[in-house]
C-alpha cells in the first residue's frame, strides 16, 4: 500500500477518534486543544449560516469532516519522513470529485429539475451559449480544486526538503512556519469553496 494511502487512512481513523473524545468529555476549564476545536466548530457554523442560512446546518458534519481531513492531511507533510496525503493528486482529485458530486446531488435533491435551469442563463435566446459556459465552469471546479491543493502542498514539501538539505540548522523553523501557514490557508480555501459550491447548488431555485 502506498504511503499517501496509509497516511489518508491514518487521518480518517485517528482524527474522528480524537474529535469524539473531546466532544464527549469537554472540560469545564477548556484545554488549549478544546479551545481550538471550539473555534473550528464556530468557524464552520458561521460559514454555513452566512452562505446557506439555518437550512445549511445539515451540511455541517460533511463540511467540518472535509476540513479536518484536509487540515490534518496537510499537516502530516510538516513531519520529516511522512508524506502528506494531500500532496498526492489522487487524494486531492478524490476529494474534489466528492465535493463535485455532493453539491450537484444536493442541488437536484433540493430543486428537482429546476436545478438545471441556471445552466440556461437569463436570456432564452443565448441558452446554447450559456449551457456550454456553465458546463465548462462546473466541470473545471473539481480540477482546479484538486490541482490547487495538490500543487500548494507538493510545492511546500519540496521547498522544505531542499532548504533543509542546503542549510539544515538554520532553515527548518522558518520553513516549518511558512508550511504551517500554507496548511491553514489551503484548508480555509478548500472549506470555503466547498461551502460556496453547495450553497450555490441548493439556492438556485430561490434566485
UniProtKB/Swiss-Prot annotation:
GO biological process: proton motive force-driven plasma membrane ATP synthesis
Keyword Membrane appears in the UniProt entry: yes
Membrane topology classification: Multi-pass membrane protein
Record GO terms (molecular function): proton-transporting ATP synthase activity, rotational mechanism
Domain of life: Bacteria
Localization per record: Cell inner membrane
Record's keyword annotation contains Electron transport: no
Keyword terms: ATP synthesis, Cell inner membrane, Cell membrane, CF(0), Hydrogen ion transport, Ion transport, Membrane, Transmembrane, Transmembrane helix, Transport
Cellular component per GO, a single term: proton-transporting ATP synthase complex
TM regions (residue ranges): 3-23, 62-82, 88-108, 119-139, 158-178, 180-200
Task of the protein: Key component of the proton channel; it plays a direct role in the translocation of protons across the membrane.
Family: Belongs to the ATPase A chain family.
NCBIfam families: ATP_synt_6_or_A
Assembly and oligomerization: F-type ATPases have 2 components, CF(1) - the catalytic core - and CF(0) - the membrane proton channel. CF(1) has five subunits: alpha(3), beta(3), gamma(1), delta(1), epsilon(1). CF(0) has three main subunits: a(1), b(2) and c(9-12). The alpha and beta chains form an alternating ring which encloses part of the gamma chain. CF(1) is attached to CF(0) by a central stalk formed by the gamma and epsilon chains, while a peripheral stalk is formed by the delta and b chains.
Name of the featured protein: ATP synthase subunit a
Organism: Sulfurihydrogenibium sp. (strain YO3AOP1)
